[in-house]
Regions:
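Structured, non-catalytic alpha/beta "coupling" segments that mediate domain-domain communication
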Residues: 111, 120-128, 339, 349, ...
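Eukaryotic N-terminal low-complexity, Ser/Thr- and Lys/Arg-rich leader segments
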Residues: 1-36, 459-490, 672-673
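Long, charged amphipathic helices and adjacent flexible linkers at domain junctions
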Residues: 326-334, 446-453, 580-605
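Catalytic cores of soluble metabolic enzymes centered on carboxylation/carboxyl-transfer
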Residues: 261, 301-536, 545, 656-662, ...
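Structured core elements
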Residues: 40-41, 84, 113, 190, ...
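Structured functional modules or segments
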Residues: 593-673
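N-terminal beta-alpha lobe that positions the nucleotide/phosphoryl donor
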Residues: 2-276, 280-300
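Short flexible coil/turn linkers enriched for glycine and charged/polar residues
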Residues: 183-185, 196-198, 224-228, 239-241, ...
Length: 673
């Protein structure tokens, strides 16, 4: 797995050529055989659906739990039985251990599969399952405890001869002690929650001056996510690779990583699926233990695709006391696999998560070498309370180039409306020459920022504007014909009348650029088109479509091109091989009103979420860059800072704990007299 990180987990496109399975050896534990006829999945979304699919294949009945926000979720419909466990906030539902155990007993479930996240690495929950004689599908409590507390795991790994990074892993947690240890280690410093994971409770302090602020932010986020704000400090290795066992490594390094992973597992008496992660120096290939995820890994489909295994089936069999189906020596690696996490997020705004309704969701069709792991469908909500993942696209190829080429082809099949996604970013990333060559590290995104976030060329922008304009007119005409009330351009030869417009100019906004497209009717399916005052072009155009959506085919100067189209509110969505573009039409064309423009004097929430803290009061003087308030969204903390010097004129009528929408004004500033 290659993590491409910018600060926290922002966007991950994960690849693995091979990975030593976490049960690389069979522990000689005296495990009694137990029948599992029914399993409760203590999770939601795509991982709950993934576990259910294998359980059903094995003839095991499945039980879902769900919050109020998930009552119509896919995993609820997929399960044989489903039980509500509380309100939307995870602390009152998916993290409520007693409610989940009550459901397990009520449903007569012999086992609980925790998935990943939530309670998957919770020691107390594992202990409670054991005390209730319910099988926890995961490692022993002792292994979760030892590996879950990062300071403890570092000490154990050091004793086991597994290399670790220079740092502080002690119990004393006073601010003064942590500041002193940071100075001893030297900057830049990585600040990490001892119970953390997934980038939560993790910050980088590049200098001593920003250490305290980053420490406090990491502690708050850790307390919210894991109920523990203890921290460890590590030397920050610049531009490392974050590795398990994967592509771009020599066989010697791969073997050394595998042996270190086995030593790590043996040191804590590990049983079950897990993943040992390392930090690797790009030049020397020296590596250091980072952490062990004591659960099924998010990227486990990569391992399954290149080994032909079903790791969830293995988990269920091992939990029932059966031996592993294969030994390490029997596992054969073949080919290369790529996993893309498709997220509702805005890459151009620091990968801020987005929440709302998926008005349109078309995904690639699963096939032999293509998997789409998802837990949402069209018309459903992506909630502010949970991770904004829409799907995991997993593609296999004979080698890296083939796998990436197939990945780009499948990514281009996505059609999403209602929420911004990272699909366009993933397309650019997976086609980036340095990425294709395997020159990947944790600073890859900022290093290649210009290429990864570049605007489309003028020619591509013009082609998309043309498609949006003609598509808008043809779809409008088609709908009007169906409604027997034709308006505007009419493409039907028998319906065309002299009093109808032969020419129409449409105003569009693409990527914040205002454009005008003039379309002149010639005859059926033929037009003359001018984009932004440029040369007139002869265009042949026609619509087609099926259950997967409307398609527009145009021919310009002998070049034939087909794109997907969707009309949603005042937007025309254009889907092509480079991703998705949204063309906005004037609001007056649809609702008779214009969009409001937010005041530049206000500080607004960058994302839907919950207001965590307001850091200023009315009348306070503030300087540019000063933190004003904190929003929690999708389990991550976002600090909103002032963009100017000024004075706090007023605060919105919201308080910590209140929900806020994207763009909601929280602090109003005015110039200092």
């Amino acid at each position: 797995m290659l993590y491409l990180k910018q600060l926290n987990r922002i966007c991950e496109l994960n690849l693995r050529h091979s990975r030593r399975l976490s049960h690389a050896h069979q522990l000689k534990a005296d495990v009694k055989h137990r029948q599992i006829d029914k399993v409760l999945i203590a999770n939601r979304g795509e991982i709950a659906c993934r576990v259910m699919r294998t359980a059903k294949k094995l003839g095991i009945r499945t039980v879902a739990v769900y919050s109020d926000a998930d009552k119509n979720a896919v995993h609820v419909e997929m399960a044989d039985e489903a039980f509500n466990i509380g309100p939307a906030p995870a602390t009152q539902s998916y993290l409520n251990k007693s409610k989940i155990l009550d459901v397990a007993k009520k449903s007569n479930s012999q086992a609980i599969h925790p998935g990943y996240g939530f309670l998957s690495e919770n020691v107390e929950f594992c202990e409670q399952c054991t005390s209730e004689d319910i099988i926890f599908i995961g490692p022993p409590t002792s292994a979760i405890r030892d590996m879950g507390i990062k300071s403890t795991s570092k000490a154990i790994m050091s004793s086991a001869g597994v290399p670790i990074v220079k740092g502080y892993h002690g119990e004393e947690q006073s601010i003064e002690k942590l500041q002193a240890e940071a100075q001893r280690i030297g900057f830049p410093i990585m600040i990490k929650a001892v119970r953390g994971g997934g980038g939560k409770g993790m910050r980088i302090a590049m200098t001593q001056s920003e250490f305290l602020q980053q420490l406090e932010s990491a502690k708050r986020e850790s307390l919210k996510s894991f109920g523990d704000d203890n921290m460890l400090l590590e030397q920050y290795i610049t531009d490392p690779r974050h590795v398990e066992v994967q592509p771009g490594l020599s066989e010697e390094t791969r073997q050394a990583l595998g042996e270190a992973a086995v030593r790590a597992a043996r040191a804590v008496g590990y049983v079950g699926a897990g993943t040992v992660e390392f930090i690797l120096h790009r030049v020397t290939h020296d590596f250091h233990f980072m952490e062990m995820n004591t659960r099924l890994q998010v990227e486990h489909p990569i391992t399954e695709m290149i080994t032909g295994t079903d790791l969830v089936e293995w988990q269920l069999r091992v939990a029932a006391g059966e031996p592993l189906p294969l030994s390490q020596e029997q596992i054969v690696r073949r080919g290369h696999a790529v996993e893309c996490r498709v997220y509702a997020e805005e890459p151009g705004a620091g990968f801020l998560p987005r929440a709302g309704t998926l008005h349109r969701l078309v995904q690639p069709q699963p096939e032999e070498h293509v998997r789409v792991e998802t837990g949402v469908r069209e018309s459903q909500e992506v909630s502010v309370h949970y991770d904004p993942m829409i799907a995991k696209l997993v593609v296999w190829g004979r080698d890296r180039n083939e796998a990436l080429a197939k990945t780009r082809a499948k990514l281009s099949e996505y059609q999403v409306a209602g929420l911004e996604t990272n699909v366009n970013f993933l397309l650019r990333l997976s086609g980036n020459p340095a990425f294709v060559a395997g020159d990947v590290h944790t600073a890859f995104i900022p290093q290649h920022e210009e290429a990864l976030f570049q605007r489309p060329s003028a020619a591509r922008q013009s082609a998309r504007a043309l498609s949006a304009a003609i598509g808008h007119l043809l779809m409008t005409q088609k709908n009007n014909t169906a409604n027997k009330s034709s308006k505007g351009i009419d493409v039907g030869p028998s319906a065309w009348r002299p009093n109808y417009q032969l020419k129409k100019t449409i105003s569009l906004k693409l990527d914040d650029k205002e454009m005008k497209v003039t379309v002149e009717y010639i005859k059926l399916n033929e037009y003359r088109v001018q984009v932004d005052g440029g040369a007139w072009q002869q265009v042949e155009a026609s619509l087609s479509g099926d259950a997967r959506g409307v398609r527009l085919t145009t021919t310009v100067d002998g070049e034939r091109r087909t794109v997907g189209l969707l009309a949603h509110q005042n937007q025309i969505h254009v889907y092509d091989e480079d991703g998705q573009t949204v063309a906005e039409l004037p609001q007056a064309d649809f609702r008779g009103g214009g969009a409001e423009v937010a005041s530049t004097n206000s500080a607004s929430s960058p994302t839907p979420g919950v207001l965590e803290r307001i850091l200023v009061s009315q009348g306070d003087k503030v300087v540019k860059g000063q933190p004003l308030f904190v929003v929690i969204a999708m389990k991550m903390e976002y600090v909103v800072r002032s963009t100017r010097d000024g004075v706090v004129a007023s605060l919105a009528a919201v308080k910590p704990g209140d929900a806020v929408g994207k763009g909601a004004e929280v602090v109003l500033l005015e110039p200092e007299n």
